[in-house]
């Protein structure tokens, strides 16, 4: 493989929903979210991240979207030797995120070419709302990027889940105009998968021949198939995706060995 050439299989690490606070010792549902996130980052070390790998941060990077929060996140990521891409979640402030976090090493780009794959990143946030929606501008951007994608295969990344995950309370906060979203997606025969955050749980389904993948949070997890807010008794984690040259995807969720210290299992929300 020559310098600058992508490997046949692209390895992508999806890390999501950190919910970092203004102070690194502040908690959310009993969890010091900074510490839990840093523990997840440390767990990546045995996998020997290479310069040819990629890391994707799919929103809710901050619970308190202040410049100091994003600047501290940048300091946590500075040791990584591979490209890092990010997009906002409903708890983020996209403008503050752009100013305080984005630089040459941490990028917020709508279209990323990865060998035979193209990654398209979207902003599904609605200001001051937990629900998701793709604005007309985002739908237009998606349509344009689908047309200009150089890869044979396309993966879409956004924060909100575009189809129900099976938890009644969480499914009030999907992409509200998912019909419009899938209408645009179905204009291309290249779309293979959608990856999202937001749901704080592992998820893997098919719709319209597109694989839809959700990933655990780095802090607390939500109980699958719950009618009301419920915290699960399962450790934090992240997802490894191997994007094959033929359009197939191999993926697994990797979790820490223990629950975060202080986790409030009985919490009724945040």
Tell what function each PLM region has.
Residues 21-24, 63-68, 90-97, 127-130, ...:
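Active-site environment of divalent metal-dependent phosphoester hydrolases
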Residues 26-32, 128, 167-174, 227-229:
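Short glycine-enriched, charge-decorated loop/helix-capping segments at active-site entrances
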Residues 3-4, 66-153, 174-190, 216, ...:
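Extended active-site neighborhood of metal-dependent phosphoesterases/phosphodiesterases
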Residues 17, 59-60, 89, 159, ...:
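Active-site glycine-centered loops adjacent to acidic/histidine catalytic or metal-binding residues
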Residues 210, 214-270:
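Acidic, His/Gly-rich catalytic cores of divalent-metal-dependent hydrolytic chemistry
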Residues 1-72, 165:
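N-terminal active-site segment of His-dependent metallophosphoesterases
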Residues 40-54, 132-211, 247-250, 259, ...:
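His/acidic metal-ligating clusters that form di-metal
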Residues 9-22, 116-126, 155-157, 210-216, ...:
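Active-site-proximal beta-strand elements of phosphoester/diester hydrolases
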């Amino acid at each position: 493989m020559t310098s600058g050439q992508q490997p046949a299989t692209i390895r992508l690490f999806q890390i999501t929903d950190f919910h970092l606070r203004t102070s690194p010792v502040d908690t959310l549902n009993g969890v010091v979210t900074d510490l839990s996130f840093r523990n997840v980052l440390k767990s990546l070390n045995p996998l020997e991240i290479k310069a040819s790998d990629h890391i994707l941060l799919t929103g809710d990077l901050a619970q308190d979207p202040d410049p100091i929060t994003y600047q501290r996140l940048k300091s946590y990521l500075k040791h990584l030797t591979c490209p890092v891409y990010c997009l906002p979640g409903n708890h983020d402030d996209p403008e503050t995120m752009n100013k305080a976090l984005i630089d040459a090493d941490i990028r917020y780009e709508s279209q990323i070419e990865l060998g035979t794959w193209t990654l398209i990143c979207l902003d599904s946030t609605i200001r001051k709302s937990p629900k998701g929606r793709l604005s007309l501008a985002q739908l237009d951007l998606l349509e344009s990027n689908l047309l200009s994608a150089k890869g044979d295969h396309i993966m879409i990344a956004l924060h909100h889940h575009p189809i129900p995950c099976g938890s009644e309370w969480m499914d009030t906060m999907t992409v509200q105009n998912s019909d419009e979203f899938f209408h645009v997606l179905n204009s291309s025969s290249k779309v293979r998968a959608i990856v999202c955050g937001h749901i704080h749980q592992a998820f893997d389904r098919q719709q319209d021949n597109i694989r839809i993948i959700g990933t655990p949070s780095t802090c607390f997890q939500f109980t699958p198939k719950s009618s009301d807010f419920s915290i699960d008794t399962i450790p934090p984690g992240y997802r490894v995706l191997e994007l094959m040259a033929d359009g197939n995807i191999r993926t697994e969720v990797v979790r820490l060995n223990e629950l975060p210290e202080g986790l409030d299992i009985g919490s009724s929300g945040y």
